[in-house]
C-alpha cells in the first residue's frame, strides 16, 4: 500500500475535519513515522558546531567549491565564504563523477585541507561520503556528512549513516519522489541518528536548458510533511551560474533553511562544475541580498 502524501492542512480543508483528527488518522499509516511532522510536530534544529544551527530561525548560508583542488584554492574560498557571512564551507574530497576520466577529488588530502580551513576560519564543514568504507574518515572531519543524489537509495550507506554521530545532509535523487526521499531519510533516522537534513538539488525532467529542474515546490511541501530541515542547492539544480543567485533567493523565499552554493576563485579554471560556480565577488553580492528576503518571510541570515 502506498500512502498519499497530502499535507494535513489540505486534507482538512477538503474534508472539513479538524487538523488533530487528520493527524491521528494518518500518523498510524504514515510510511516514514520518524521523519513525519504528524508524529514529530516540532521543527528539528541541528547544531553543527557551537553557534551554527540548521533549521532554526536563521537561514544558513553554505559556500565552497565543488571539489577541493589545492590549499590556495580552498583557503581563498573559505575566507570569502566567511567574509560574506557564510557559516558552512562545502567542498568535495571524494567526487562521484559521471565519467571515470573526470577529476575524482584529492581524497584524504582533501579532508586534511578542509580540516585546516575549518580551524583557520571557524567554519563548519560539509563534504560527501561516497561509500561505507569512507564514511568514518569523512565523519572525522565533517560537521555535516553529505550523502549525494546518486547514493540516496544506497541503503547500506544509509544504514551506516544512521550509526554515526554526525549530522547527515541527504540530497534528493535525480528521479526520486518526495516519499522515496523521506523514506531514505527514515533509514538514517531508524538507525539512531536523529540529525538529518534534506537537500533539494533539482530533478531530471524533459527540460534541456538547465542541468536539472529545481523543484522549489518541494520545500514548503516537505516542510509540511516533515520536521526535518530543508536545504536547496541551486548550483546543481541549474548547472549555469547566471541562474544560481535568482534560485538561491527564491529558495529563501520558499522557506528553505539553508542554501548550498558552489563558488570558486576562478570558475573558468575549476576542475569540476566551473560553469555553475559563482566567482567570489558574485557570491558576496548574493549574500548581501539574502537578509532582505529572509526578513520578508520572518527569518534571518
Question: Where are each of the predicted segments found?
Answer:
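Glycine-rich, proline-tolerant flexible connector loops at the mouths of alpha/beta enzymes
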Residues: 90-108, 265-277
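Alpha-helix-loop-beta-strand connector modules within alpha/beta enzyme cores
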Residues: 103-127, 161-167, 216-230, 276-299
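Non-catalytic terminal accessory/regulatory regions of metabolic enzymes
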Residues: 1-54, 58-61
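Glycine-enriched alpha-helix->loop->beta-strand junction motifs that scaffold or abut catalytic
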Residues: 85, 137-146, 162-168, 189-195, ...
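Hydrophobic faces of well-ordered beta-strands that scaffold small-molecule active sites
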Residues: 60-65, 87-91, 125-127, 145-147, ...
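Active-site mouth loops of central-metabolism enzymes
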Residues: 59-74, 99-104, 124-128, 149, ...
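N-terminal active-site wall of soluble small-molecule enzyme domains
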Residues: 96-142, 146, 154-157
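Conserved anion-binding
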Residues: 93-97, 150-217
